Design a protein with these regions (language model features):
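Transmembrane alpha-helix segments characteristic
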Residues: 16-22, 241-242, 390-413
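Transmembrane helical bundles and short interhelical boundary loops of multi-pass, membrane-embedded
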Residues: 22, 453-519
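Hydrophobic, aromatic-rich transmembrane alpha-helices
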Residues: 50-51, 179, 345-393
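Short hydrophobic/aromatic helix or loop-helix immediately within or flanking a transmembrane segment
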Residues: 107-156, 252, 341
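Transmembrane-helix motifs of polytopic, lipid-linked glycan transferases
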Residues: 146, 162-185, 376-380
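Transmembrane-helix signature of polytopic, membrane-embedded enzymes
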Residues: 157-164, 178-200
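Membrane-interface helix-loop-helix junctions at transmembrane boundaries of multi-pass membrane enzymes
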Residues: 184, 231-237, 380-403
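Membrane-interface alpha helices of multi-pass inner-membrane proteins
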Residues: 205, 224-231, 238-260
Length: 519
């Protein structure tokens, strides 16, 4: 090997090595245990993924913008996780054991506690964790991953920041795939906006910084999104990537993997079959309907059990929710809590809720602002796909829009309107949420559509009236409080008026043009 080849080889390795060494130092510094042991563990995990990230970046075009996006996606999630780990014991609730250990969620705390106990007391072999059942991880993936990390890399201290590190790397790996898919299939503007939403969306940052499965699933779904967008160009390669993503999802969530299979089949049906003939079109619709019926019949007992438990938990934790459910009747409580869950995290509630700590107030506002900034663009897009002129493009967007609406509703219903679990399920399909949000903004801007403004005004009406309701709930001596149902009535009436203007204005314009034509 000559000197030039050696220099090139050094340059190839120096970037990932330095990045991994620096990242490992930061992770170890803010984690428990001996610094050198923690640094080595983080370095071993980070280096191979750094090489993968660099390869993905080059494959995605090697643009500086994409590199910035990937670094931002990684840094925000790892930074939030390390900050939370160190700040929660100080600024969290002192009577919550998981917060005193630096965990945002009790689920992650109990799962990690079980994994640490198994790794340190039972000394399992490499394959043994794959065959056992866990009390706090029904899918096994996160528990097995934690056991392996603690047993082989971190036996001296419980460094769950290593799980956060891996999750941040997975999310960052999805960036070049997601952006390239949108850039090639739609246009650069949609691609850039959607990719930045993917990077900065608050709930994605919060859940990724909490040793949860969401960042792993989101990263895999971003890659799967690319495979679906390119399936018509090179179906063998795309199908292989898609299959690999689904298989990797299974240890984290069979439910999400099944949902990914559903949207994949729908996408492929629209892309290749639906436009061939009416037989393929209606055959696919019939098969889809039959599949939904069979799925509901088989899964209904489990779904009812989950929903009943989550709804009951929500009612116990919220006195006013229990009161409202009592007023409307038990037969409507699932529908009410599903709709209520779509509004979670409720921005007015977080703004005025007390008592709470500064940390939880800041995190709550951060999450709620992200969702409420997305909602008008997202729902405008989901209800505007019918207006796309190209038939095949409209069909593809419509199928995906129906899937997203279904996923949002199922997430809300499954979580019983909970302010944490509901957004947690919803954010898993962030690539689809980010795409439709970006597409809606670009579509409205291109056709100069006032309907987007109406969606924004409707949301402002909701925020305004419920801000009054929540503020008066906690500060009754300052302002008169509207009854809940009166508040809902005001919101519905004002929203209906705003919505009606979208139909009245074209009608008036048509009448005027008719008169002008008649004269």
């Amino acid at each position: 090997m000559n000197l030039g080849d050696g220099k090139k080889s050094f340059q190839e390795w120096s970037g990932p090595v330095l990045f991994s060494a620096g990242t490992a130092a930061v992770v170890s510094w803010f984690s428990a245990g001996a610094f050198l042991t923690g640094w080595l563990a983080a370095f071993v995990l980070c280096l191979p993924f750094s090489l993968i990230l660099r390869t993905g970046w080059r494959w995605g075009g090697g643009e500086k913008l994409v590199a910035v996006m990937m670094l931002a996606a990684f840094g925000l999630r790892l930074g939030f996780g390390l900050a939370t780990q160190n700040l929660l014991p100080i600024y969290g609730y002192p009577d919550e054991p998981q917060q005193q250990q630096g965990y945002l969620f009790d689920d992650a705390y109990r799962r990690d506690d079980e994994a640490w106990r198994i790794a340190t007391t039972e000394s399992p072999s490499f394959f043994e964790p794959l065959t056992r059942s866990y009390n706090n991880d029904q899918y096994r993936g996160m528990a097995v991953l934690s056991i392996w990390i603690y047993w082989f890399l971190s036996p001296d201290a419980r460094r769950f920041s290593l799980i956060i590190l891996l999750g941040a790397l997975f999310t960052a790996a999805g960036v070049p795939f997601f952006r390239k898919a949108l850039k090639n299939r739609w246009d650069p503007q949609i691609a850039n906006i959607a990719a930045w939403i993917y990077v900065f969306y608050p709930d994605s940052i919060v859940y990724a910084g909490s040793a949860m499965r969401e960042p792993f699933l989101t990263g895999l779904l971003a890659i799967a999104f690319w495979a679906l967008c390119t399936v018509r160009d090179h179906w063998k390669k795309s199908a292989a990537v898609l299959l690999g993503c689904v298989l990797l999802m299974l240890p984290f969530s069979t439910f999400v993997a099944a949902a990914a299979v559903v949207i994949s089949l729908l996408w492929i049906w629209v892309e290749f079959l639906a436009s061939r003939s009416k037989k393929w079109l209606w055959g696919g619709v019939s098969l889809l309907f039959l599949g939904l019926l069979i799925t509901l019949a088989l899964a209904l007992p489990s779904i009812r059990e989950f929903i009943h438990y989550d709804i009951h938990t929500t009612e116990i934790n919220s006195g006013w929710v229990e009161k409202v459910v009592g007023e409307i009747g038990g037969q409507f409580r699932a529908v009410f809590l599903a709709v209520y869950g779509i509004t979670q995290p409720v921005l007015p509630a977080i703004l005025f809720y007390r008592p709470t700590t500064v940390y939880w107030k800041a995190v709550g506002i951060f999450r709620a602002v992200g969702w409420y900034a997305m909602v008008p663009f997202l729902f405008y897009a989901l209800f505007s796909v019918f207006r796309v002129k190209d038939r095949k493009e409209r069909s593809l967007l419509l199928v995906n829009a129906l899937f997203v609406l279904g996923w949002i509703f199922v997430s809300s219903l499954r979580a019983g309107g909970d302010q944490w679990d509901n957004p947690r399920y919803r954010v898993i399909f962030l690539p689809w949420l980010a795409f439709f949000t970006a597409w809606g903004y670009c579509f409205a801007r291109r056709i100069k559509d006032w309907w987007l403004l109406r969606w924004i005004l409707i949301e402002l009406v909701f925020i305004g009236f419920f801000s009054q309701w929540y503020f008066s709930r906690y500060y009754a001596d300052v302002i008169h409080r509207f009854p809940f149902w009166k508040t809902v009535t005001y919101i519905v009436v004002c929203s209906a008026v705003i919505f009606a203007t979208g139909f009245i204005h074209p009608l008036v314009k048509k009448i005027r043009s008719g008169k002008d034509g008649g004269s």
